[in-house]
């Protein structure tokens, strides 16, 4: 996929939603995957997987609050319906190895449901710049 094709698909900006308390760490170290945050703080990523509540990890670059994984846990009894291999823990570990971006700004109602738990920030990132950095990955 070319840079232009990527921008045509996702638009000129992509968005990342994060608790406002994460902004200090993002400024200090950039966006990192939850599993990497766990490793940097000396935890095994499996220790933070399948979180029932938001979990804050503290490393040298500052705190990072990870969202809960209640949607996964709510579907636990039906995991075989959506997992073709592995366990729910395996899936949670895969999700924690990723950073999620949205191709368009979320509806206000979606952001409000997140903010009901904790104040959030919506980060806007240049899609072309993101492609330039990660196209080879």
Predicted regions, residues:
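ADP-ribosyltransferase catalytic core
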Residues: 52-137
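ADP-ribose/NAD+-binding catalytic cleft of ART/PARP-like enzymes
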Residues: 1-90
